[in-house]
């Protein structure tokens, strides 16, 4: 099966066999062989060979190509959304939203290039000071499974606009989506070697990340993999490394009159995408008061009524499956561990059908756990922490090595002003779901959540480096020579 796109041709993998499955039915969605190290070499070589011509095409030609890709995406939106739903288990409505976001972010990427990079000139005496931006060359993109179309293209599109060539290695859990997307790039007329796709698991990823022929790497995924990449590229300052990783995100609730809206925002923050967004609320901080008790009671009731189902159900669910049986098993094991440490089950996360990755929402009160593990449980499991004062809530919120997102639901602006200043996070929301973020704003975190903002509006900053120069049309002597300088005897 030809599943790798190298130098403009589809080729069969020479590595180990692997497959992806629908997380509910376990039907095979993709079957093929991983790229071998030699095929990774070929992909990097193809990108290097295509780089100079792609760079020299100029911005307008490159922009025209990504705009054609946006048009092709629009023409094939329903089909790509169906593949995303089939392979990830997310509901069709959400998969369609993902494809639409892919399309919309292309305009954001073009705007960002012109506003943040591009070329700038200013007069500097008898010269012109010029800042131009030059592409790195060949960049690797490693994508996640939770948004297998949208998030990789958040790196790929800005990289191509800047003049780089790309070698893309998707998650081994979503190879079919990656193949479909690459075929759409082919339909849009991507030149041979400018975008290359290599499929596979850890071995393929290690070969690509460690390849001496790449000039940089953009990654979205787990902190564990991101940390491994950071170690692998250590001591190579000549390579740009931009990491977007996970979070153990806090959401604080205090002094809010509209309880129904608060419940909505908590549900949206915690359980959208079956909890498989890096910005999902993992920890819900609620005051230890009768009002807090009432809020939790209503939350548990509302969460218990969230519809969970197959991606293509006629009556669309709010939540689909998590990505795999293994992921579901890990989440259930995490719940059991937290209970063994002293957590109280407010709403049990359950496997809804044996042999599937369909999980119901789970809510645990972990206030009694003195040493709460600082872990990201990537699924529909939220941990409640009760607090006595806002000082304590802030302390609990920041008690994590991560720093991606943090949120406050409160009618009191003065609390938010303090929360914004003291929260250790790259995204800080007030009275909005924690999962909400603007494509025209930087996206990323601090600490173990990442080191740069290589997608959305700020992606342009990491896809090219600035070149500063002083320029004059002719050589001319200065009005006055420096002391001690004589040009004639």
Swiss-Prot record:
Record gene name:
astD
Q: Which residues bind NAD(+)?
A: 221-226
- Give EC number(s), comma-separated: 1.2.1.71
Q: Does the keyword Iron apply?
A: no
Q: Name one GO molecular function term.
A: succinylglutamate-semialdehyde dehydrogenase activity
User: Which reaction(s) does its UniProt entry say it catalyses?
Assistant: N-succinyl-L-glutamate 5-semialdehyde + NAD(+) + H2O = N-succinyl-L-glutamate + NADH + 2 H(+)
| Keyword Kinase set for record | no
One GO-annotated biological process of the protein:
arginine catabolic process to succinate
Give the pathway annotation. Amino-acid degradation; L-arginine degradation via AST pathway; L-glutamate and succinate from L-arginine: step 4/5
Lineage, highest ranks first: Bacteria, Pseudomonadati, Myxococcota, Polyangia, Polyangiales
User: Per its record, how is this protein called by name?
Assistant: N-succinylglutamate 5-semialdehyde dehydrogenase
């Amino acid at each position: 099966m030809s599943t790798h796109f190298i130098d403009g041709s589809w080729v069969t993998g020479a590595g180990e066999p692997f497959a992806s499955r629908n997380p509910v039915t376990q039907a095979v969605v993709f079957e093929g062989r991983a790229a071998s190290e030699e095929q990774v070499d070929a992909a990097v070589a193809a990108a290097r060979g295509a780089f100079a011509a792609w760079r020299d095409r100029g911005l307008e030609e490159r922009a025209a190509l990504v705009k054609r890709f946006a048009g092709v995406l629009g023409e094939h939106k329903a089909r790509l959304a169906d593949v995303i739903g089939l392979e990830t288990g997310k509901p069709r409505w959400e998969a369609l939203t993902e494809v639409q976001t892919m399309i919309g972010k292309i305009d954001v990427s073009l705007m960002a290039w012109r506003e943040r990079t591009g070329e700038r000139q200013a007069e500097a005496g008898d010269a012109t000071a010029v800042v131009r931006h030059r592409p790195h060359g060949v960049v690797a993109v490693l994508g996640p499974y939770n948004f297998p179309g949208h998030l990789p293209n958040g790196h790929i599109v800005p990289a191509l606009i800047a003049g780089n060539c790309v070698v893309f290695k998707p998650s081994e859990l979503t190879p079919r989506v990656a193949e479909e997307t690459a075929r759409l790039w082919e339909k849009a007329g991507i030149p041979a070697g400018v975008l290359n796709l290599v499929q596979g698991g850890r071995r393929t990823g290690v070969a690509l990340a460690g390849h001496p022929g790449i000039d940089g790497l953009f990654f979205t995924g787990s902190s564990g993999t991101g940390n491994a990449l950071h170690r692998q590229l250590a001591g190579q300052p000549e390579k740009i490394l931009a990491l977007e990783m996970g979070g153990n995100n806090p959401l604080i609730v205090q002094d809010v009159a509209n309880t129904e809206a608060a419940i909505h925002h908590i549900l949206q923050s915690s359980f959208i995408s079956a909890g498989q967004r890096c910005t999902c609320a993992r920890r819900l901080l609620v005051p230890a008061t009768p009002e807090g008790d009432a809020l939790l009671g209503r939350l548990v009731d509302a969460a218990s009524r969230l519809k969970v189902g197959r991606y293509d159900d006629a009556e669309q669910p709010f939540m689909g499956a998590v990505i795999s049986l293994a992921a579901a098993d890990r989440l259930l094991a995490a719940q059991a561990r937290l209970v063994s440490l002293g957590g109280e089950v407010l709403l049990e996360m359950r496997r809804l059908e044996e042999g599937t990755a369909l999980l119901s929402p789970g809510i645990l009160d972990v206030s009694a756990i003195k040493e709460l593990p600082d872990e990201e449980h990537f699924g529909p499991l939220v941990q409640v922490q009760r607090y006595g004062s806002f000082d304590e809530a802030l302390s609990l919120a920041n008690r994590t090595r991560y720093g991606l997102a943090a949120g406050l639901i409160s009618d009191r602006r003065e609390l938010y002003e303090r929360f914004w200043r003291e929260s250790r996070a790259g995204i800080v929301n007030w009275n909005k779901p924690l999962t909400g973020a603007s494509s025209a704003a930087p996206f990323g975190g601090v600490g173990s959540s990442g080191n740069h903002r290589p997608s959305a509006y700020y992606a342009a900053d990491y896809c090219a480096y600035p070149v500063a120069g002083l320029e004059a049309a002719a050589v001319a002597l200065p009005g006055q020579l420096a002391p001690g300088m004589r040009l004639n005897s």
